[in-house]
Amino acid sequence: MIQYVKRSCALGLLALASAATLAQQNPKPVDTQPVTSTHIIGAAKLIIGDVKQNQAFYEQMFGMKEVSHYSAKDVYDEPIMGFSEGARLALFSPLAEAPIKKSQFPVALIYTPDFEGVVSRIEAAKHPVTRLPTAQSGTFKIAIARDPSGNAIEIFSRPTGILEVGGSKLIVDDRQKAEDFYAKVFGAKPGQRYNTAAYDEVLMQFGAGPFLALFQPKAEAPLPKSQFPVVAIYTSDFDGVLKRVTEIGLGYRDVKSSSPDTRIIIAKDPAGNSVEIIRRAPAAAAKK
């Protein structure tokens, strides 16, 4: 795991996050990211348990603030967390789905210019966190923390940058199949690759926005997947994306939205990860 984090975070420097926001099921999604590509990673989505406990963790440890909040009675409760800029972190609490076992590997990456301050707060609060030794991290300062629901979060020091969510990380059971899926559906381009005795990973690039890491553990058996999304992707080519998702045949479901100009589907990737795909109207985006 230590070796994985070293390589993955070093790569993260090549995939700096720009502005994005999350949309969720009921209201019209709030889209604040400048248009830089057809498809954009809007948010990393974490499956959590207790909302107040997990929200407090991200507020107190990282200084994140709630920017939106969505819910559906007896189905889910979801605060949307964000920094002043960049992609969002959605804390999704299913109300009728049993807790699932979490991977030992990170599912999101956060950049910080105050690495020592952030990690020290987490240590003082007695939350699980591991600093990588210099022998493993090289010139980088890296730590892995776990939120109250057990999600592993990669913390990467970027002294000249700002606090922001740098990428979403999906655990897959076949990196090549997953890569082919995201390349075909979204035209995502593979960036850095890492293949060791412990894992096989590629970072998929979505324009100037956050990266999407596809991480295949070689010593961790595939774990159960939630029926709910673990990443949200905006697209201005919704019809084209839907056509390609349909052709691949892994299935999708429509999600109702109260806004007539918004359409959302949840598709399955080859690993069984649920992917939220949100229509981003070209005409509306052009007004930004």
PLM segments and residue spans:
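Sec-exported extracytoplasmic/periplasmic mature domains
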Residues: 59-63, 114, 123-127, 173, ...
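Hydrophobic h-region of N-terminal signal peptides that target proteins for export
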Residues: 14-22
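Core segments of cupin and vicinal oxygen chelate
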Residues: 35-39, 45-88, 169-212, 263
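Short, charged/polar, Gly/Pro-enriched secondary-structure boundary elements
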Residues: 86-90, 100, 150-153, 209-213, ...
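Vicinal oxygen chelate
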Residues: 24-37, 39-50, 69, 79-83, 87, 98-170, 191-195, ...
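Bacterial N-terminal signal peptides that target proteins for export
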Residues: 1-12
